[in-house]
Amino acid sequence: TINLDYKTTRLKYSGILNPFQLGYSGRNGITYRQQLRFSKTFKKDRQLRFRPEVGFVFKRKELFFKFEGDWEYLPEKQGALSLSLGNTNQGYSSKIMNEINEQLKDSTFNFENLDLEYFKHYYIELKNQIELFNGFQMTTGISYHRRIPTRKSAIDPGDGVTEIINENYHDFIPTIGFSYTPRQYYWMDGYRKEYLYSYYPTISIEFGRAIPSVWKSSGNYGRVEADIHQSIYLGLSRRFNYHISGGLYTAQKSTYFADYRYFTRHNFPESWGGDDFGGVFHQLGSVWFNASDKYVQAHAMYESPFMLFQLFKPEATKHIISERFYLSQLWMPVKPSYTEIGYGFGNHIFNVAAFVGFDKLKYDGIGFKFAFELFQ
């Protein structure tokens, strides 16, 4: 890892051959990524930030990249203009799913057995965030999405469906979102306002509207998502986090891809510092993240330095800094009840966790995740 801090310029690079950038999860297998962080501070603490990263998922042989930059033009109001471009998870639309199922009802094919990773997803997004008053932020943005088939389908499920799964899709989506944390405590680091904590939850809502006929865009639909989360500190390094969110697609006048902000697959295991709320499904199959036009999810995480290891291996507590219990629940029309229970432990060097999934209370698999904490 390379760290450079010279006057108003900072540079951090993970290094080309750095084993601490390796990770593992049951769904994705071994992962490896590279991260670079650059920042330049100007007068009145205005700051330019550049954060490119690239990662590879060995199990699926997929390369992910993201180039992101911010210009913090009004640090006392957390005003920042951001530009991001990259690729995300492959997927397909709910309409494609419905069409294929209709055509395959009388065939030997089964939806669950098909290879459903039909479309690569590339995007570019420009957004602006600013605080209107203490704890209340507004975010506006525009994004453009391009989805192209990973390959021309060899399956011929019926008239019309082959064309649907071999077509390119483009979406132009303006968004507006609001986030509010009542009685938000903060401090001023020079001109820069930094949030500290609040005894109340953070409530967020975002509206998006796909507009057709803009740069070849064909999407014509709406998306609404809401989220509430909070981290409650209980003293002695103990805390309880919860995270509840839901979303739906409205006014569906075109083919659309169920691409949610809060309900998405994570490809790279995060360090515990980047996993504050535990709001992630680790064992849920990738097909389900695109399978519905609406969802509701809830996650809870309890963290404490003395739990199972204190009971069964007291001598190990000097090496284990903290333990965590996870509980997650998902509802979608196509999957009315999915539950995950997890347990993890970690220290300043690594974190590891195990998760068990249940579909309608029936065992649905077990998996593990591992990530290094050093040099993150």
List PLM regions with ranges.
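Exposed, low-structure sequence patches enriched in small/polar residues
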Residues: 1-376
